[in-house]
Amino acid sequence: MTIRSAVRALLAASLVIGAATAAAQDKPKAKKDSTKVKAPKDSTRTKGDAAKVPKLWASAAPLELTLKANLKMLRRDKKANSPYHTASFTYTDADGKPQEVPLRVKTHGIWRLAHCANPPLRLNFSNKLAKGTVFHDAERPKMVTPCDNDKDSEQYVLQEFQLYRIYQLITPMSHRARLIRITFADSATGKADAPKYAFLFEDPEVMAVRLGGTLVKQKGAGPDDLNPDVAAIAYLFEYMIGNTDFSFWGLHNGELVGLPTGDNLPVAYDFDFSGAVNTHYATVDPQLPIKRVRQRLWRGYCNENASVPAAIETFRAQKSAIYALYSDDIGKLLSPSIVKETLEYWDEFYKKLERSKDFLDSCEGKN
């Protein structure tokens, strides 16, 4: 089986399964192969071997960790190309044994790097030193932490993590993520912060390899450069969560995975400016025809509209599973008021799907 036929198989399976389980919906017919996109034969495969899913992503259970580093030096790094610092993770493994894993860590990001007391972090593990631990084969995950040291910031992180979980339910063409409960310990002073929830998500280049391609670093991809089926799912997800702070053209909060076939698969990430999270610091681009972050705006290209009905069936099929995320052990970490508001926001989205033409008319690229 070629890479092209394999990638197509995974995408088609996702859409067909979604359609088959959607209540009172007809099973959509398979589209002709006009998109030329194929899914990887094995979505857990890494380059050169058939490795299993790394331990870090194989479990959904929150992971208790302590990060020991020179926190003062680390947190004062506010430049785009900050240096790595030596650090270590300690945790208790499944057998109850304490584990310590050395790593390198540095700050990264744009808005959160400049404005947050706790900037996002990029982690870098040595596979040799991480062998036998939960971080073996994790490579270079990113860490999203509460922006400030307050309860609202921690709730924002939990809300954003839920969106990564939803995206993974919808499509494997998304970042894997894992919730953590982390304690930051300063190696210089011996002092430790209060533990807080954060999450790790898959490195973009690692994700691209998993999907059978490479990360596209050249900006400027237009509507004809994106696979329309995958783009329809990505844009519908952004519409669902009320996110307008992204651009696949500009590679801003959106990535492209380039396949050997020439196809480009858009993948969304970074959702703290979305209406679903509704952070106090989120704003709307004044050039857009909306005033509040909770307002939804369709930002897809018009040439992808034909692929939207199949994408809608996938979202409908996952509705129960999506709602269930807010009553499981992780969902219960959210405040009841946030759960109520979020489910009402999803209710509104699913009602809009009944009249998709209303929002598709605002597509970009009309003649």
Model-derived segments and spans:
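Generic alpha-helical structural signal
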Residues: 18-19, 263
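Bacterial N-terminal signal peptides that target proteins for export
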Residues: 1-10
